[in-house]
Amino acid sequence: MAKFRASNILGDPFALATVSISILAWLIACIASIISDIKTDYPNYSWWAVAYMFCCIIGVTIVFGSDTGLVYGVAVVGYLSTGLVLTTLAVNTLVYADESSSQAAAAGFILLSMVIVVWIFYFGSSPQATHRGFIDSFALNKESSGAYGNRPMSTAFGPRPDTMSTSAPQMYTSAQLNGFETSSPVSGYPGGAPGSENRSSSQARFGNPSASNVTGNNNGQDEVPQPTEYPYKAKAIYSYDANPEDANEISFSKHEILEVSDVSGRWWQARKSNGETGIAPSNYLILL
């Protein structure tokens, strides 16, 4: 589990406001319940609501502090739904009491119920939801995929390299090259830098140029050459687990820096720091 950081709460206005209001509401309900229990017959199950909501507030605070809302969102919604039932039942009993302390406890439970409804709406929504992206946009230490999922690609980096071409590399004869032969007719393909090998090794590698060209044209549509240049860098705003049935996908963790060669479409060709290459969903990444 991610480490708890107070800055995740202090830097998030939504988390700071809702957690603060929930703590205040719980204190009102708890203190008023103690006073009401001394003066009158206080319903026993309302104490369970007080204890249960204390645990829920602690749990939500930990989720906000560790920034794991996407991981534990479903569990949080389930626990909060139970808490909403308990606080509503407590309000229904206490709000009609004659004792002012019981009515104050009911007010605390009403405020707790309102915060619970807001939390359920937040954690129960997908990260791409408009309202969640808007809320997360105010956080200093959180980046929402919804804010970048549909944004236009920046043109500040110039035209993207054509690294995903399916056409086979053009082969030339020695007469056409007129002494400018290299070990590879296209930079980045096996053979190293230009001039690193002599002409004989180039002929041994490619054999008959015309035969290689025919073979390349036949197989070029089936095999996609891997790009060798990754001019862009992207930061992962969410963790992603690759589909085990798709060997082309790669997994990465949140805040990991990836090198990207192609920034068109919904899937980007990327390379990790350990050299692993594959495709990654663009709405999980943001260009640096």
Swiss-Prot record:
Residues 36-44, 92-103 are extracellular. InterPro entries: SH3-like_dom_sf, SH3_domain, Sho1_SH3. GO terms for cellular component: plasma membrane. Residues 197-221 have a biased composition (Polar residues). GO terms for biological process: regulation of actin filament polymerization. Plasma membrane osmosensor that activates the high osmolarity glycerol (HOG) MAPK signaling pathway in response to high osmolarity. Forms homooligomers. This is High osmolarity signaling protein sho1. It comes from Neosartorya fischeri (strain ATCC 1020 / DSM 3700 / CBS 544.65 / FGSC A1164 / JCM 1740 / NRRL 181 / WB 181) (Aspergillus fischerianus).
